[in-house]
Amino acid sequence: MENKKTIYFLCTGNSCRSQMAEAWGKQYLGDKWNVYSAGIEAHGVNPNAIKAMNEVNIDITNQTSDIIDANILNRADLVVTLCSHADAVCPSTPPDVHRVHWGFDDPAGKEWSEFQRVRDEIGERIKRFSETGE
């Protein structure tokens, strides 16, 4: 258990994209990775993100919206920013923490199909990472 790696998904509000990424991460990576998400701010989990994940039988009602925790950030093996704002303003990561940017559109305030599209794109990206390490 202790030799699990840590992956940290970050976006602006820890409301939609990073919440969905955390859920997909737990599904696809949970046996090898500790999966966390956070935001530059904490806007609360978007009800449509909960609904979108329910459609694929993943329950995120118990996930919380959190601001970036320096302890997790500094010990993460991989930090993934999901929006350009988070990529630009994310606190600097130590040199030994690998950081990548996987950009996704923000579905907040958009029509329902956007939540479904972004949910599926994030799921596919994390599934690919679980299979290829990239």
From Swiss-Prot:
Alphabetical list of CDD domains matching this protein: LMWP_ArsC (cd16345)
Compartments where located: Cytoplasm
Keywords, sorted A to Z: Arsenical resistance, Cytoplasm, Disulfide bond, Oxidoreductase, Redox-active center
Reactions accelerated catalytically: arsenate + [thioredoxin]-dithiol + H(+) = arsenite + [thioredoxin]-disulfide + H2O
InterPro entries, A to Z: Arsenate_reductase_ArsC (IPR014064), Ptyr_pPase (IPR023485), Ptyr_pPase_sf (IPR036196)
Active site: 11 (nucleophile), 83 (nucleophile), 90 (nucleophile)
Intrachain S-S bonds: 11-83, 83-90
Enzyme class label: oxidoreductase
Domain of life: Bacteria
Protein family according to the UniProt entry: Belongs to the low molecular weight phosphotyrosine protein phosphatase family. Thioredoxin-coupled ArsC subfamily.
Protein name: Arsenate reductase
Lineage, broadest ranks: Bacteria, Bacillati, Bacillota, Bacilli, Bacillales
